[in-house]
């Protein structure tokens, strides 16, 4: 595999039919014969693959920057991009601080970059909401937090993600557009927890 390409395979351990993709490819395999067919991948030295579940909007994602003999843990590959190795996926999860049961609230995040992701309160996983190359540009997403029982939206706003050159990580910048009844904290270089504090 060359430095700027990846090769997906239809069988584990790099077996079966191979399918090469290059840096910059933004692939949606939905409605094609290759949807959910890839089970292993070889990755060039200067790129990585960011893959995510697309049609059920979970935003569950994986990033692969080295060869992977088994990628089936993503639960079927439909959407992926081949990006420079320094690119970071941006991901969020929802934490409910109001005391409701697990999955009482959902947070839908709309992004021009990767589409829509939906995460639920109490869920352990992060949903992919964007991609940021080293040094930017910024990524803006719209967020909608909904009470799944009543259907009422309890928080709406936007998140403005920017590159922090000092820490080589992503940060949230737009306090004025972030919902007033929520807080956020960075868990890792690129993963954030959005906390719902109240619904009044």
Feature annotation, model-predicted:
Residues 1-113, 120-128, 132, 136-156, ...:
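Compact beta-sheet-dominated domain cores in extracellular/mature segments
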């Amino acid at each position: 595999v060359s430095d700027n390409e990846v090769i997906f395979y239809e069988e584990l351990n790099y077996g079966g039919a191979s399918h090469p993709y290059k840096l910059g490819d933004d692939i949606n395999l939905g409605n094609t014969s290759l949807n959910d067919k890839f089970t292993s991948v070889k990755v060039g030295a200067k790129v990585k693959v960011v893959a995510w579940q697309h049609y059920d909007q979970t935003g569950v994602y994986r990033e692969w920057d080295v060869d992977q003999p088994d990628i089936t843990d993503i639960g079927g590959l439909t959407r992926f991009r081949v990006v420079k190795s320094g690119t970071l996926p941006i991901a969020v999860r929802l934490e409910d601080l109001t005391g409701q049961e697990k999955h009482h609230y959902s947070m839908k995040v709309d992004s021009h970059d990767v589409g829509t992701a939906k995460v639920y309160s109490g869920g352990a996983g992060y949903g992919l909401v964007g991609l940021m190359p080293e040094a930017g540009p910024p990524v803006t997403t719209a967020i909608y937090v909904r009470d799944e029982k009543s259907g009422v939206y309890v928080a709406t706003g936007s998140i403005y993600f920017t590159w922090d050159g000092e820490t080589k990580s992503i940060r949230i910048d737009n306090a004025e557009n972030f919902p007033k009844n929520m807080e956020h904290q960075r868990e890792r270089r690129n993963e954030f927890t959005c906390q719902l504090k109240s619904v009044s």
